[in-house]
Design a protein with these regions (language model features):
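Conserved N-terminal catalytic/coupling substructures associated with nucleotide/phosphate chemistry
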Residues: 1-170
């Protein structure tokens, strides 16, 4: 009976944790972009501007998108930190949309190595990109990745803590 009660308690705690994570994500999706919150449709996959549909025939990574993600993370590191959600379509301020459109990161998986086309492989690639692109060697210690699922789509949540400032530095 004690084992049963213990497992029920653990399950209940996990459900509460998942609900809390889900509620935090919904709050972010309802916000507009700001100096501390950015949405990116993807790391590499291109979407048509007007229709918003995925460009299915794309063979090469869109490195402009990758660069945009890296610049956003660098900006967060060098200011007050922030959250980047990859797999979310930008929500124009005047669109009247209450919640940003969730696209998911799965279209980016096609450029990951076979057997690594999942959040773990995505994590590895992102941290390699950060390590190779960001000039501060401790930058990765200020970045946390999470992969919540919303409406059946995997999102990459990148939480960035600001780098410490040197005394007297603005």
């Amino acid at each position: 009976i004690n084992d049963f009660y213990s497992s029920i308690t653990e399950l209940h705690d996990e459900i509460r944790k998942q609900n809390r994570i889900g509620n935090q994500l919904i709050d972010l999706l309802m916000d507009n972009e700001s100096p501390k919150l950015e949405f990116k449709a993807s790391l590499w996959a291109t979407y048509h501007g007007v229709s918003g549909k995925l460009v299915e025939e794309q063979e090469e990574k869109n490195l402009k998108l990758e660069d945009s993600v890296l610049k956003t993370v660098a900006g967060f590191l060098n200011t007050d930190g922030g959250t980047l959600l990859i797999g979310i379509k930008d929500k124009p301020r005047d669109s009247g949309d209450k919640v940003a459109e969730v696209l998911g990161i799965e279209p980016d998986f096609k450029w990951l190595k076979k057997g690594k086309r999942d959040p773990e492989g995505y994590t590895h690639v992102l941290f390699e990109l950060f390590k190779n692109s960001l000039t501060n060697p401790v930058a990765n210690q200020h970045i946390n990745l999470d992969f919540p699922v919303y409406q059946g789509q995997i999102i990459c949540r990148v939480d960035v803590q600001p780098l410490p400032r040197i005394l007297g530095q603005q």
